[in-house]
Amino acid sequence: MNQFSLHLNAQCDCVLILRSMVNVLCKRAKLSQIEKNRVGLAVDEVYANIVRHGYQRQAKPMDFHADMKKDDNGDDLLIFTFRDYAPVVNLSDWDCGEVKPCCAETIVPHGLGIPLIHTIMDQVKHEAFDDGNGWTVIYRSKKKIGEGK
């Protein structure tokens, strides 16, 4: 079975638990070390945004699900879903479209997480609920030439 679920009181140090779940799925999908690090970074960033911005660093409940499925091409889909109970996020004023390149001279703290997540993951979804938010990020592991199914 390639599913993991976790209900936790979200705190900064809990990212280690989420990362271990991500690492198991990445290993099962036979991702390279670079891919594994990138997927882990994107999941860490979603989690950090919930803890920092949604919960203002207060320990509050959150659900996390990690799943791996095959698509119609035989590629692995790594699906990570977060359910928070923070104030509903209004994405209408977010510019999550085209990611603009940056350089060391223009990098400032904050504001790079969302573009980073969109760059790494193949799909990023947000769903507003009456009592919080749902976040889904999906990574597609493309089969390399010569690999079996």
Say what each PLM segment does.
Residues 33-60:
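Conserved ATP-binding N-box helix of the HATPase_c
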Residues 1-41, 148-149:
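Bergerat-fold GHKL ATPase/HATPase_c domain
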Residues 60-69:
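A conserved short beta-strand within the histidine kinase catalytic ATPase domain
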Residues 73-110:
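Glycine-rich/acidic phosphate-handling loop/turn and adjacent ATP-lid/helix
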Residues 68-72, 128:
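Short, low-complexity Ser/Thr-rich regulatory SLiMs
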Residues 9, 69, 83-85, 138-142:
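Solvent-exposed residues in well-ordered beta-strands and their adjoining turns
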Residues 1-6, 102-106, 112-149:
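Flexible, glycine-/charge-rich segments associated with ATP-binding catalytic modules
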